[in-house]
Amino acid sequence: MPEGGTFLYDFALPDAGTFWYHPHLNSLEQVGRGLTAPLIVDEAEPPEVDADLTLMLNDWRLDAEARIAGGWDDLHDRAHAGRIGNYMTVNGRPVEVQGAEAGARLRLRIINAATDRIVMLGTFGLRAYLVA
């Protein structure tokens, strides 16, 4: 595809769900620089919810000037297929507390795009159901 050009992919998506896409060529660096995005395939009959939220979690290794740090050839990071960052984001923004009305039904589509971090999540006393 030429620089600045476009290309339209046309393909069937047989399964509904929450997915994400990212490169597999030099993926440590490209994913580490943020080349990722959610891919949501809706059901034919989606559940009734008050809000359907996609939360893409990531951590970034930033240098002292708050730029994405280099060091893409670090053997430790490559051996572990990822690197721990020092700054967490949700949907590319600083982590914020999210509120909801009492009794609201929320669908959270959670994607962990961090290359080497396991993110612990909790519902803090709320009733939650794992769908998939």
Please provide the spans of the model-predicted regions.
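Short loop/turn segments at secondary-structure transitions that flank enzyme active sites
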Residues: 27-29, 45, 61-63, 114-116, ...
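Structural recognition of the beta-strand scaffold that forms the well-ordered cores
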Residues: 9, 53-56, 130
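Solvent-exposed beta-strand/loop surfaces of large extracellular or lumenal domains
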Residues: 123-132
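Extracellular/periplasmic metallocenter environments
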Residues: 1-50
